[in-house]
Amino acid sequence: MPRKTTIRISSNALASNLRTIKNYANKSKVWSVIKSNAYGHTIKAALKGLKETSGFAVLELNEAVLLRENGWNGPILLLEGFFEESDLLEICQYKITTVIHNDWQLNYIKQYDIKSPIDVYLKLNSGMNRLGFNEKDFIRTWYDLSNLKKISSLTLMSHFSLGFSTKTVNKQMNIIRKIFKILNPTLCLANSTAIIFHTYTHKDWIRPGIILYGILPKENKKISKKFNLKPVMTLESRIISIQNIKSKEYIGYGKNYYSNKSNLIGIVSCGYADGYPFSVPFSGTPVFVNGTRTQIIGSVCMDMLTIDLNDCPNAKIGSKVELWGNNISINEISKLANTTSYELMCRISSRVLVKIE
């Protein structure tokens, strides 16, 4: 019998979030970003919940092939492009749109005998300073590619480094506008934060990532109420032991939690080997048990953690414990753990059960 530590993935929540995004950016097509196994939610869940997307954006070629093998016939974007010249065979075979962000990729394209023309997203480094061509080299490369019969279409792609900052976005947009006046390209610019905070960046295509999964990239009560995004992932486990602890006792490894009163505690079968963050405080991190919000006490262990049951009189062996989801925000946990919700979702262990609903 497997351990009960489980992530539940709501395909209905995924579909709802996509509808919300499409309604908000209703003049743009949508690349649903499902890199890193759909931010830990699984490609299978993405296919089920995001059927109405315009296309899927992935990182690795094997994710793109998996989409095709599971029946997706629409557009697929390879966000970092190809890594080897040999990758171009599958890009052509599976009709995948590739990013080009560097001269070495450009040279591979020129050298490779491409039988069927491919779609290319040319990456502009407008200020992120990670991937892409600078302004001058971008224009040169654009003209270079546009003269190749093996290229069927070109799109300008860029990425905002601080999507909620008007100053930063405008600085990058000024560079993009200069190039737009020269080339008049199709544009793909806005990531999740820019989609929400800067509607003028929406253009032809948008690339929502974290917001598809019900998480705002920056906490904002007004925005949260406006969008009403639904959490897609719930991490839950079960109580496997209940202990009555006398006053003036330590709980768990390292004597990190001292109780000066009698305590009813529950041992939950989830730990850092499952992906729950070890770095949360020794008290105060919320969990949800039988309709009651309570807290973790003591250190998170490899396979278990301890919770306070003093205010949960109905808790028993086998009671469900929500660690994040509809009742406990993953953003709240990530702040307490001094990390991000992105990291928490992506680092769920392979030993955790996945249930797609």
From Swiss-Prot:
Record carries keyword Cell membrane: no
Enzyme class at the top of the EC tree: isomerase
Reaction(s) catalysed by this chain's protein: L-alanine = D-alanine
Pfam families tied to this protein: Ala_racemase_C (PF00842), Ala_racemase_N (PF01168)
Gene: alr
Name this polypeptide is given: Alanine racemase
Family: Belongs to the alanine racemase family.
Keyword hit for Isomerase: yes
CC cofactor: pyridoxal 5'-phosphate
Listed SUPFAM superfamilies: Alanine racemase C-terminal domain-like, PLP-binding barrel
A molecular function (GO) term: pyridoxal phosphate binding
Residues recorded as bearing N6-(pyridoxal phosphate)lysine in the entry: 35
EC number: 5.1.1.1
Domain of life: Bacteria
NCBIfam families cross-referenced by the UniProt entry: alr
Gene3D superfamilies from the UniProt entry: Alanine racemase, Lyase, Ornithine Decarboxylase, Chain A, domain 1
HAMAP family registered for this protein in UniProt: Ala_racemase
Species per Swiss-Prot/TrEMBL record: Wigglesworthia glossinidia brevipalpis
